[in-house]
């Protein structure tokens, strides 16, 4: 993926419209190309990468379940989920829905399913950011809906590199589509990343 991305950038630099970006070689630990790499911006659903890490590292119940509640609907107004409400769903299925389909409700359900409150979970996300040296990063929710979730491209390189150690994150985030088992139903979802959905790239992590 990284070779292809660099090739595109070198041939067509005018196609790059991001306010900031980093092309990073994880094999040799070096920046290949960047623009405003330390600029702090809202990171939206990239937040879910940290949510996945914190959940996997803190959940001690392999059989845990969680339900989408009215509180989730009140917080995430204006967004949609295919997952049923008030239905116990396996945390593994919620993780799949979050990483494949970027489901905001799944992210919020997971944030109170690892043996702590939602606020404690957000605190763990910020602690992990500091541990990884992500000095420009702050989290205020687990889905990325809040504009208060901020980071820089260079900080996100650190998060991506750390996430490479978790096969579950790598495998789920790169599935073009998936079936989520919820309340006796199989809910079909597609990856929200078109490049992954159409299998344009063989990504290290998405």
PLM feature spans:
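Domain-terminus/edge residues, biased toward the C-terminal soluble/receptor-binding domains
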Residues: 135, 147-151, 155-206
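Active-site-adjacent loops and short helices of periplasmic peptidoglycan-processing enzymes
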Residues: 16-167
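Intrinsically disordered, low-complexity boundary segments flanking structured domains
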Residues: 10-11, 51-55, 181-182, 191-192
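Sec-dependent N-terminal signal peptides
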Residues: 2-13
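Non-catalytic cell-wall polysaccharide-engagement segments
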Residues: 2, 124-127, 192
């Amino acid at each position: 993926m990284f070779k292809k991305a660099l090739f595109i950038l070198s041939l067509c630099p005018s196609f790059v419209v991001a306010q900031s970006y980093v092309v990073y070689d994880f094999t040799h630990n070096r920046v290949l190309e960047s623009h405003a790499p330390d600029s702090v911006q809202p990171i939206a659903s990239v937040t879910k990468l940290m949510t996945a890490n914190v959940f996997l590292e803190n959940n001690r119940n392999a059989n845990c379940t969680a339900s989408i509640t009215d509180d989730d609907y009140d917080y995430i107004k204006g967004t949609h989920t295919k997952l049923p409400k008030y239905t116990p769903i396996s945390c593994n299925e919620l993780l799949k829905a979050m990483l494949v389909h970027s489901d905001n409700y799944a992210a919020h359900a997971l944030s109170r399913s690892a043996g702590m409150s939602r606020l404690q979970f957000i605190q763990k996300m910020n602690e992990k950011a500091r541990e990884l040296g992500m000095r420009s990063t702050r989290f205020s929710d687990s889905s990325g809906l809040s504009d208060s979730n901020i980071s820089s491209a260079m900080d996100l390189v650190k998060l991506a590199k750390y996430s490479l150690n978790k096969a579950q994150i790598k495998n789920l985030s790169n599935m073009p589509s998936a079936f989520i088992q919820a309340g006796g139903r199989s809910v079909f979802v597609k990856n929200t990343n078109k490049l992954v959905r159409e299998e344009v790239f063989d990504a290290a992590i998405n």
